[in-house]
Amino acid sequence: MSKLSFITSNQDKYREVKSFFNEHSLELGWTRVSLPELQADTLEEVVEHSLSQFNGEDVFVEDAGVFIDALGGFPGVYSRYVYDTVGNAGILKLMEGVENRRARFEAVIGFKPAGGGDVKLFKGEVRGNVSLSPKGEGGFGYDPIFIPEGFIKTFGEDESVKSMVSHRKRAAEKLLQYLKRNL
């Protein structure tokens, strides 16, 4: 396998995935490219579209979202836009008075081998609840309002929990298993 490169403009995502790769003594390159945010119905569509723009080296991209049950899965694939527009405060405003606070983070990683070939998709998910207020300064995005199932603190309060159970880590683990078996 040639050098594997993560294509993202998001330094926080890169840092999170690189940490996981470091745990497995694997080198991970970073191609810092700002990809246009495709408005699609699924994370998989966004990832496949992003990968269609790259050839020549082993690359992967990742897209993620938070899907809130009481809001019909919103913001879902529009998570970045919604976060940039209204932030956590806007989500919490929408959730005022809502008892069902169930939510899930989903991440989809798409891998494209050097020289083309079929794109392989790997999905990770973590279930939990939306907190009543933002808690913690750690992480990024929706981390301060997401409490993973089985824990009492948000990802923003305890980044060590996120590093153990995050949706992104679960997708990256599947990518790593694939790479070990196939390349």
Each language-model region and where it sits:
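Anionic-ligand binding patches
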Residues: 2-5, 12-183
